[in-house]
Amino acid sequence: MDNRKIGIFDSGIGGLTCIPYLMKDLPDEHVIFFGDTARTPYGSKSEHVIRRFTLDIANFMKSKDVKMMVAACNTISAVGLSALRDEYPDMPVTGVIEPACDMVAEKCGIDEHIGILATKATVSSNAYVDAIRVRKPDYANIYQTACPAFVPLIEEGITDNNVMKEAIKYYLDDFIRDNKIDMLVLGCTHYQLIRKTLEEIYPGLGIISSSEEVATSIRNILSSRDMLAGPNDEESVFYASDLSENFVNMITALLGKEQEELNIRFKSLDI
């Protein structure tokens, strides 16, 4: 048993979408969350910068004595995860890409057309395609597209109005039609926040979310190391490098609590 907190981090607010699934599945666990809202989005940055930012956050998490680290950001999972594991070889580390690809392999038939929506950095890394084909080498119909406007809009709280709907149609109408997509994979944790809008615009399409699947990965890793928490009085803490109104609103909405009930703090990483 290990009652230390789990360190979860993201380039912004998207990683918050993982936390309700974690708390439902593992109610005794508590988290330290860090959202790098001052430097978001990561998806358009160089790999060198993404790795440097990843280690900035990881060093902060290590200083808080977390028992494992979760890169709840697909861009970090695609580009920075190996650097994180190299820096902290004794620390359990997971990202969000592999759990999502496990679900793709479980849910999708060999003839289905899979569409991966992600940031430019994640698409360029080919991480999703490679991970899916490790699991299912015969999958031939895997397509991916970058949607760079989504994260900035979501960070501003724009998730279901006409601006977001037009952005979705701009990126996805031709992509879905031309590639005969059957299943969308939300390859960015931010995109969970527009899932309902996607379902409204494209009814009948299957959707797999990287946000939903990571709780299972966390459970498996901690269980295998006998590190699951028991009943305790710990408290989750939420940090952001820019404590915006939207960050606070997102936490309260996702967790169903008032701001006064939550431990929300500002943390600069020497930006």
Q: Can you annotate each of these PLM segments?
A:
Residues 1-271:
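Non-catalytic structural scaffold of enzyme domains
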